[in-house]
């Protein structure tokens, strides 16, 4: 019995030594390096990314790239982001405002984004994906709203402590972000050129500088966000969703961090859109045109355990392939 104990202790010691020796050979852990263009710029130009565990980029069509970037931030919290990079100089690609049931008027929030996108998805006018856009209230979006060159809502609904801003996409596909105060003059000068307009708040970047026009206490919590950034050429656009309110999955962003992200990419202008449970990022997959099942929700809307919220409006990314 004594001999058996000696053998047992000796074997345990050898196993322990072997384990320690193996550990010594693998103690140098290195976080994965970014592989996407977006990931590389965010790592190089911000201090928010501590360790990347997913950085995947794929092209839906020439001029439309998706990047899905997941990481631990500098506080050790999980963050999952979803990005579109869109080149509007590609003659096939357009950004188009959409409404519930493809109505030619604004209405109450009564349709999910995936269903809204499916209404305009057809041969020759192929939906590649989309995001949610403006905050909603009552019978429509809170800001002015244009669809296909037609103004569906011509007034801004006041939002306390958050100056309203608009995004205009002209018929020649130039993207401009301005304030409610600037809208009358912009409309007078560009009304005949305007195609799509949607709104959001607050503005994040103005003329290449961070300028968030809200009281600090409105940026005291990290939330799911949706946002748009525009490069100086006015034809390169970033659309972004970050998930939040789910600790082990993703923890959202403060507005300041959101602004820093778009600054890191080189955006000249950026605007926060409706977030929280409205934040939705959709990529169209193979399938039958007009079928909502073709619309793949890539993020995790935090309403109802990942269920899409009913929305007032959205933005479609379209390939015109006629």
Question: Where do the language-model regions lie?
Answer:
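Structural recognition of the beta-strand scaffold that forms the well-ordered cores
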Residues: 128-132, 166-168, 175-178, 229, ...
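Conserved beta-alpha junction segments in alpha/beta enzyme cores
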Residues: 70-74, 79, 193-195, 199-234
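Conserved, well-ordered active-site substructure
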Residues: 140-161, 213-214, 218-232, 236-269, ...
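C-terminal motif of bacterial Sec signal peptides marking the signal peptidase cleavage site
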Residues: 16-19
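Short beta-strand scaffold segments in enzyme catalytic cores
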Residues: 82-86, 133-134, 165-169, 203, ...
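Zymogen propeptides
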Residues: 21-166, 174-177
